[in-house]
Amino acid sequence: MPHPPIIIPAVGKGEEAKISKTVNAYRKAAELIASMKPETILVTTPHSVTYADYLHISPGSSAKGSFARFGAPQAAAEFTYDTEFVAALTGEAKKAGIPAGTFGEKDPSVDHGALVPLTFVNEACKSPYRLVRCSVSGLGPLVHYNYGKCIAETAEKLGRRTVIIASGDLSHKLKVDGPYGFAKEGPEFDRQATDAMKSAGFMRFLTFDNEFCEAAAVCGLPSFTIMAGAFDRIALQTDFLSYEGPFGVGYAVCAFTPLGKDESRDFGSQYMEYRHKAMNKRRGSEDAYVRLARLSLESWVGKGRRISAPEGLPDEMLQKRAGVFVSLKKDGILRGCIGTILPTQENTAEEIMRSAVSAGTRDPRFSPVAPDELPDIVYSVDVLGAPEPVSSESELDVKRYGVIVQAGGGRCGLLLPDLPGIDTVKAQLHIAMRKGGIKPSDSYSVERFQVVRHT
């Protein structure tokens, strides 16, 4: 289910008529939920507190929510939490090795990602239910899928008649005049996602490319993936109720009803096999730069030893010096990135080896890479050209040039070129300055550089 606040009459004030398909579909879905007389409704929402490496579950016995931040404080509701379910789910997740629980609450109020669908449910559902509100995280798709399995196991063990609502919009980049603009990936994501909903082909939720999703500005995918896991190895009846995007954001409503066991729908195992094959293919096509970065980190993390430059490296790696950045990703999500603007080692090979180890163990944004993560790490190596000063933004190009912003006190921020989600020079400079602790009002200089990227 999507969660546009404008669909609530007190917020939309008539504008909700422009998404009448979604309104009507919401009412049908709410009536279906009401007919099931659920004891517990679990909502997955991307707008509760989120963490990169932790799946938050709202704590406490009850909570209130309103649309005050959207100009309608009178549109409000209060909910009773299913504390027994929350405790049991936390335990199931712990047994599965999934970091989830009630720690880290910041705002106890019910967010609009949950409040929008529950407003419709409350209109249709006259029997009382208890709520479980689950956030998403920056962890990979398999973690979210397995978390969904924990939700289903919890409901079964407690004997709870449970409905899961996967709250999330699709792409936010469907129209040039929309609030987030247009990207060609937007309509394509929505097409593929709605096809997956119509066919209950949940494998697609697990295999979307992360950079593609960033370009499409996707909101709901982790929610959908948790829901998919809750229906692991279960045959489904699918009722695709609506899709539209008149405001530039994709809204889809789809209902799934379990029909019984179906072992062929074990998408978690299928995804692991898919990922294994894809990684083997990637490892087989590595060039010398990427292979050296991988071997360096694997030796340090796995054996505690730094490697020497292996025989057979290209002359350019041994005879030239350059700044190097090594980036690590896991499940398409950044896992570490460290490097040097100018060369600090004897040659490019030594620069790669040192930066690879640092990216995996010394990036302050992340915990060090663990040995069991090594098979899932994807490496890229950027070899930097010499920086050159620029005097205006017209000399910059986010696809072609990286930027270095420097200010007094040794402050320096660097951003590599051609990064997903960074489409303008202003955004590129803003991020580089933020990384360097540089304010727009400070006196600063800008340099540009090109890279040769090895992936």
Feature names for model-found ranges:
Residues K281-G323:
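Short, basic/aromatic recognition patches
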Residues T40-L42, V163:
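Structural motif
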Residues S135-F189, L328-T348:
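Active-site beta-strand/loop microenvironment that shapes enzyme catalytic pockets
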Residues H47-V49, L170-S171:
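Catalytic metal-binding/acid-base residues of hydrolase active sites
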Residues M1-E39, T50-K149, D177-A288, D372, ...:
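Flexible, D/E/H-enriched segments
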